[in-house]
Amino acid sequence: MIINKLDSIEFRLKELHDFTWLKKYGTAFWVVDETGSGCICIGMEDAERKYFCKIAGVNTLEAEVSPKESVVILKEAVHLYYDLAHPNLIKIIEEYDYNQFYVVVFEWADGECLFDHWNFETYQRNITMKSPREKFRELSVSKKLKAIEVLFSFLQNVN
């Protein structure tokens, strides 16, 4: 395990990489490095907006595929994003190859994952913390129905 750093954000990978080329999107403020996909996700922000940068070809600690396979998989996924374009689906700003990596830059979307398995132990240790799933369960019926309407609106696009 090697500690990598971009701005004040530290993350663990199997190898040391220089991610300073991401500085064109601003400053790093968030990272997910424990993925089985062989991708690392880095949140970047400049004075005007935030970006979600997904980078394939990185040898993550939890990778279930090789770096080269992760590049192929992400490139295939990008085609699906374009095919499924919808107002409620995160939008791709750009995608490109960079050295051995494949990079997809998305608009940032604030929110939480309803099934954030990486935090299960955190919620068990701190019973005062509510998981996103618990927060969703506590929403009013009208807000839950609105969420379902958004989901169904998206699913109408899927063939």
Across the structure, where does each feature detected by a protein language model lie?
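Juxta-kinase regulatory segment immediately upstream of eukaryotic protein kinase catalytic domains
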Residues: M1-W30
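Protein kinase catalytic-loop region centered on the HRD/HxD motif
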Residues: S153-N159
